[in-house]
């Protein structure tokens, strides 16, 4: 399971890439900063769902901030 699938690795204020619902078929990623974490479970196979500061909603595919190291 990737880091983006574990809620513990997602924090408000970090920079991430998400895939929005309408972009699931194309896989187009949207970059932004996490405003709120929507997924309540500790992990999710398709990525943790978040709201970005822009108001866009998507599932995290990549964590761009390197706070894990």
Task: Please give the residue ranges for each predicted region.
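Basic/aromatic-rich interaction segments and small domains that mediate binding to polyanionic partners
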Residues: 2-68
């Amino acid at each position: 399971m990737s880091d983006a699938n574990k809620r513990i690795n997602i924090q408000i204020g970090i920079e991430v890439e998400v895939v929005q619902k309408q972009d699931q078929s194309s896989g187009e990623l949207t970059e932004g900063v996490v405003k709120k974490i929507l997924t309540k479970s500790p992990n999710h196979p398709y990525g943790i769902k978040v709201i970005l500061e822009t108001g866009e909603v998507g599932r995290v595919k990549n964590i761009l901030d390197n706070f894990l190291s």
